[in-house]
Amino acid sequence: MSHPYASPFAEVIGDPIAQSKSPLIHGFWLDALGMEGDYRRAHVKADALAAYIAERRADPGWRGCNVTMPHKAAVMDLVDDPGDIRGTIGAMNTIVRQPDGSLIGTNTDAAGFYSPLAELDLEGAPIAVVGAGGAARAVLFALARAKVGKVAILNRSPLKAMGLLATFGLKGDVVALDAALPPVRLLVNASSLGMAGQPPLDLDLSPLPDDAIVYDLVYSPLRTGLLKAAEARGLDTVDGLDMLIGQAALAFELFFGAPPPEGRDDELRALLVA
């Protein structure tokens, strides 16, 4: 893979960070394009975040970083231009260093989530989303831009879910996790349910129409119980690697000035699940 400490370089920061697959993704693309550069993990604790940003800002070889938990909110106060993130998604997952050392923050999660759905016309379509955390905010932001119809949020905290509908100007309802699913066009799991080490997401998919799509943001395991149930019903599915790769593709171009190579996604997916 790409050589460590090559310049230019970008990083992914978080605490913990060892589990991140971002270095595999960006390293694969750098090698495939024959580009100079590197992308690596940086374990940054909360009390060292400001010092990390200040140090990297002064390094002209540093192109920026992706941001994972628990820093996605805190970094908004450490960049020069956070855009409209604070009042919308409320989380920043990408920082890009400009030639003058100024830092621009953005969030590629929403666009990354929507990339495998881009060919669909979801305007006015009914949607169901499981979860009301940070991932759900990115999902709802993207769905609002797509002008979807009513959105049902399945979540244990009704007030939090209703607040998200209001934040993104969406019409819809809050549904209990054990209630019957509405007959939606798209069902998205934006929670940690079904992830390795977490409780399963047990939903009865029988109310879904035959043309429904089931999208699970979880990618460990890749074939979650939800996706297996959807496949058993003959429904189209989208797994969590699509969002992971989609958001990384946008960040890669911001960091290194070139889009990822085309036609190599199957190789990349095989690398990520190996």
From Swiss-Prot:
It catalyses: shikimate + NADP(+) = 3-dehydroshikimate + NADPH + H(+). It comes from the Bacteria. The keyword Amino-acid biosynthesis applies. The keyword Oxidoreductase applies. Transmembrane segments: none annotated. GO terms for biological process: amino acid biosynthetic process; aromatic amino acid family biosynthetic process; chorismate biosynthetic process; shikimate metabolic process. Shikimate binds at residues 20-22, 68, 93, 109, 219. Keywords: Amino-acid biosynthesis, Aromatic amino acid biosynthesis, NADP, Oxidoreductase. Its EC number is 1.1.1.25. NADP(+) binds at residues 84, 131-135, 217, 240. CDD domains: NAD_bind_Shikimate_DH. One of its GO terms (molecular function) is NADP binding. Pfam families: SDH_C (PF18317), Shikimate_dh_N (PF08501). Pathway: Metabolic intermediate biosynthesis; chorismate biosynthesis; chorismate from D-erythrose 4-phosphate and phosphoenolpyruvate: step 4/7. The active site is at 72 (proton acceptor). One of its GO terms (cellular component) is cytosol. Belongs to the shikimate dehydrogenase family. Homodimer. Involved in the biosynthesis of the chorismate, which leads to the biosynthesis of aromatic amino acids. Catalyzes the reversible NADPH linked reduction of 3-dehydroshikimate (DHSA) to yield shikimate (SA). This is Shikimate dehydrogenase (NADP(+)). The lineage of its organism: Bacteria, Pseudomonadati, Pseudomonadota, Alphaproteobacteria, Sphingomonadales. The gene is aroE.
